[in-house]
Design a protein with these regions (language model features):
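Generic secondary-structure boundary/loop-capping signal
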Residues: 1, 51-55, 61, 86, ...
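Arg/Lys-rich, positively charged N-terminal/basic patches that mediate binding to nucleic acids
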Residues: 1-36
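Residue-level recognition of specific faces of alpha-helices
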Residues: 13, 36, 40-43, 66
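A general secondary-structure boundary signal
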Residues: 30-34, 38, 62, 78-87
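Basic/aromatic recognition patch in beta-strand/loop cores that engages polyanionic ligands
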Residues: 47-83
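Enriched for short, Lys/Arg-rich terminal
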Residues: 72-73, 77-115
Length: 115
């Protein structure tokens, strides 16, 4: 069975998420959400292909897969010995821009906000 390995970015993001939730909603809520995320990630050991391939969903060249849990996208890669957690992004974050440099802002939004 493969082990889960977190990149430093993913581990930092998980800690920051716990801190932000604790400040906003309290420690108990933060623990519950982080447990939900980490339990779902641990479940990848039983079924590593649970998440769809990013390349099939978004037409980008990538070996990443992702799962969606507790309003967060968790990106991971299947390796020989590990399932590597690359990073996680809240559903409101533009992960396509942050991961792949792909701008997903629709033209009408750009026009409206004059960006």
């Amino acid at each position: 069975m493969k082990k889960i390995k977190y990149t430093p970015d993913a581990a930092d993001k998980l800690r920051a998420l716990k801190s932000a939730i604790s400040q906003e909603y309290g420690e108990d809520k933060a623990k519950k959400i982080i447990k939900s995320i980490t339990d779902t990630i641990k479940g990848l050991c039983d079924y590593e292909e649970k998440g769809p391939k990013v390349s099939k969903m978004f037409d980008v060249v990538s070996d990443y897969r992702y799962i969606f849990v507790s309003r967060n996208y968790v990106f991971y890669r299947i390796e020989d010995k590990y399932i590597r957690i690359i990073n996680l992004y809240h559903e409101k974050e533009d992960f396509m821009w942050q991961l792949f440099g792909i701008d997903t802002t629709p033209q009408d939004t750009i026009d409206y906000w004059d960006e």
